[in-house]
Design a protein with these regions (language model features):
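Active-site SXXK
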Residues: 113, 130-156, 180, 243-247, ...
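Structured C-terminal helix/loop/strand segments within mature extracytoplasmic catalytic/sensor domains
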Residues: 27-40, 360-409
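Active-site-proximal loop and beta-strand segments within enzyme catalytic domains
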Residues: 84, 92-98, 114, 124-127, ...
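Active-site Gly/Thr loop motif
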Residues: 269-274, 325-377
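N-terminal leader/targeting segments and the immediately adjacent pre-domain N-terminus
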Residues: 24-125, 153, 182, 219-221, ...
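Active-site-proximal alpha-helical segments within enzyme catalytic domains
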Residues: 183, 239-246, 286-309, 366-382
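Active-site helix/loop module of the DD-peptidase/beta-lactamase fold
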Residues: 131, 150-188, 222, 249-287, ...
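Catalytic-site signature segments of enzymes, centered on catalytic residues
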Residues: 126-127, 192-194, 201-280, 288
Length: 409
């Protein structure tokens, strides 16, 4: 009798455990994401931020940046970055500190075109397509160079209205292609990401509505003039969107297709990319929104450091990269950076190790760091809580330490 009772209890216990396990496994994983306004407000909690930043194609319509059948291999370097100690603002940090505190979901370091360090975190994998944010601006700059080399754009001194007559009679009358590339149009613009009334957020609202191809002109034509063109720097995502519209008008080709033709396929990217659109089947948002895997961002950086060459021939004019990656003598660029043609430069006071460096940078911690003098490319994919200003550790201090370490090995 006691034995039968024991067996019954044991059986019930096993059934309970099995049912409990089934119940646990049946719980759906949380795949919810935030919206575009949440990204720019900086209102997402950490896990949801990662889910959102890795799935923005669920927020905006996109066009595929097609990869080819031939993938360019990235081999392992004999110089491996196995450990790192560095000082930032008087405190000592290591690699895990930087990843954790600056919320880096992906880091890739290429030395002489080979992988010296690669790390993924917060659930991100080598196959995750992550948002570039404004790093896309540096891609667009390179496409302008390609359009000049291909003869679609005659000169950077051409007026913008030659290619975009929609801007005739606006504050962009008399602004050159070069002025746009330098963010020095002289047109008034407020880039504040967290201010719903800013020009940047007005642009975002058009993108959220996704109901009109080329809607950017509805905002840009209404802007007023603040200064003469070519004199003062004023960061404007709207102007890079205009540059994208200009390239598309000149080439008569969607930006994603031109990027695929000139870079994605010939460079040997491993995966298709995506590019945000202003409307379904509409125009690419030139100022942001390229989605790619970490290694493909790295391949683009190495392509730039190698002179933007395909089969030994550069896709941009002679001297383009040196010009694009050098600071322009215009007022208004503050902090440790200068600005070229949609590329950030680094001022000497940030450290001699950054001499000749140029960078693509995007909100929430995205960057593409190119150090030609040491043949080093570093890609950082971030999931920081706020669009700007919330990194715990100065990225430039970390980047300098990586370069110094690899130089010493």
């Amino acid at each position: 009798m006691l034995w039968a009772g024991y067996l019954m209890i044991k059986k019930l216990l096993i059934i309970s455990i099995v049912l409990f396990s089934i119940g646990l496994s049946a719980q759906p994983s949380d795949t919810s994401i935030g919206g575009a306004r949440d990204i720019y407000d900086g209102s997402l909690y950490p896990d949801k931020a990662v889910r959102t930043y890795s799935r923005t194609e669920r927020i905006f319509p996109t066009r595929v940046i097609k990869a080819g059948s031939k993938v360019s291999p990235l081999l392992q370097s004999s110089q491996q970055l196995t450990s790192l100690k560095f000082i930032s603002e008087g405190k000592t940090y290591d690699l895990p500190d930087y990843v954790a505190l600056n919320r880096m979901v992906g880091l890739l370091v290429l030395k002489d075109g080979k992988i010296a360090y690669e790390h993924y975190d917060f659930g991100v994998t080598p196959n995750t397509r992550w948002m570039s944010m404004s790093v896309a601006k540096s891609f667009v700059s390179t496409l302008v160079g390609a359009a000049v080399k291909d003869g679609y754009v005659s000169s950077l001194n051409d007026p913008v209205t030659k290619y975009l007559p929609q801007l005739s009679g606006s504050a962009y009358e008399g602004v050159s292609v070069r002025d746009l590339l330098m963010m020095a149009s002289g047109v008034k613009w407020n880039e504040t990401y967290t201010d719903p009334s800013s020009d940047r957020r007005k642009l975002l609202e058009l993108q959220i509505a996704s109901n009109k191809q080329g809607a950017i002109f509805d905002v840009m034509k209404t802007l007023s003039k603040a200064s003469e063109p070519g004199k003062n720097f004023n960061y404007s995502t709207g102007e890079t969107v205009l540059i994208g519209e200009l390239v598309q008008a000149a080439t008569k080709m969607p930006l994603a297709d031109y990027l695929s033709k000139k870079i994605w396929i010939p460079v040997g990217m491993q995966a298709n990319g995506l590019w945000w659109l202003d409307s379904p089947e509409g125009h690419e948002v030139g100022g942001s929104g390229i989605l790619a895997v970490l290694r493909d961002f790295g391949r683009f950086g190495q392509f730039i450091i190698n002179g933007a060459k395909v089969n030994g021939q550069s896709i941009v004019p002679d001297g383009w990269l040196a010009d694009a990656g050098s600071a322009k003598p215009i007022a208004g660029v503050t902090g440790k950076n200068g600005y070229g043609y949609q590329w950030w430069t680094v001022k000497p006071e940030a450290g001699k190790i950054h001499e000749s460096v140029f960078m693509g940078r995007g909100i929430h911690g995205q960057y593409l760091y190119i150090n030609p003098a040491n043949n080093i490319v570093i890609v950082g994919l971030g999931a920081r809580p706020k669009p700007v200003g919330k990194q715990a550790i100065d990225d430039l201090d970390f980047l300098a330490a990586v370069v110094e370490t690899l130089k010493a090995n």
